Swiss-Prot record:
Its main location: cytoplasm. Keywords: Chaperone, Cytoplasm. It comes from Vibrio parahaemolyticus serotype O3:K6 (strain RIMD 2210633). GO terms for cellular component: cytoplasm. InterPro entries: Chaperone_TorD (IPR023069), DMSO/NO3_reduct_chaperone (IPR020945), HscB_C_sf (IPR036386), TorD-like_sf (IPR036411), TorD/DmsD_chaperones (IPR050289). PANTHER family: CHAPERONE PROTEIN TORD, CHAPERONE PROTEIN YCDY. Belongs to the TorD/DmsD family. TorD subfamily. Pfam families: Nitrate_red_del. The gene is torD. The keyword Glycosyltransferase does not apply. This is Chaperone protein TorD. One of its GO terms (biological process) is protein complex oligomerization.
Length: 215
């Protein structure tokens, strides 16, 4: 059980890391850490899994190209703004409602469902994420909290039940729209940093789902 809980902590940290990338632009200082040995080792570790390797390689390639980009932080911040903060017509808005909602507008049914899930779990999401509940960063932050909450359980059968709920969340709240989101990133993210992050997130969700199902 202790091994499972230790692995849960790693899983939660990875989802929180993804959440941070979709929550806001990277600062100059944050971007510098992506060229550090620590982050590169973390990415290399993820890339040791064959199912994650292509997306990790794309992300590392984008990071390497960033080092040759003039005003890299400003350019990447502009990419973030163009992709995630402007219009659905020319970007990839990171809200589930834009992909699986009925109206094609923000704050549709997916946002309501997320609000209910959060209330039912009694899980607080990072208060700095001032976004509708179906924003990708909010959903990933919530999933990390779900995983950590399960570490309070002591019986194996209860952990198995928690795994079922986590997998349901991945399938229903994330994989139901992430592929469409990634397609939009592919269409509009010319440099490819955020596209590679989206592709890595999808690959990780698939891998994590297989783990939760015991495959």
């Amino acid at each position: 059980m202790q091994e499972v809980k230790a692995f849960n902590e790693k899983r939660a940290e990875i989802y929180w890391w993804f959440s941070s990338l979709f929550a806001k632009e990277l600062s100059e200082k944050e971007l510098e850490t992506y060229h550090s040995v620590e982050i590169r080792s973390f990415l290399a570790g993820l890339g040791e899994n064959e199912s994650l390797k292509p997306a990790v390689d794309s992300l590392v390639d984008a990071l390497n190209r960033l080092q040759d980009r003039n005003d890299a932080q400003l350019e990447l911040a502009a990419d973030f703004c163009e992709l995630f903060l402007k219009t659905d017509k020319y970007g990839a808005l990171p809200y589930a409602s834009m992909y699986i909602g009925e109206s094609g507008l923000l704050n549709d049914k997916p946002a309501e469902e997320m609000e209910k899930l959060m209330a039912d779990f009694g899980v607080q999401v990072d208060e700095n994420l001032k976004e509708p509940a179906d924003h990708l960063a909010v959903e990933l932050d919530f999933l990390g909290n779900m995983i950590i909450r399960s570490n309070e359980l002591e019986q194996e059968k209860h952990m198995e039940e928690a795994f079922v709920k986590q997998n349901d969340f991945i399938q229903n709240q994330l994989m139901s729209w992430l592929p469409k989101f990634a397609e939009k990133c592919k269409q509009f993210d010319e440099f490819g940093f955020y596209l590679s992050v989206a592709q890595l997130l999808i690959a990780f969700c698939k891998l994590d789902s297989a783990y939760l199902l015991g495959e």
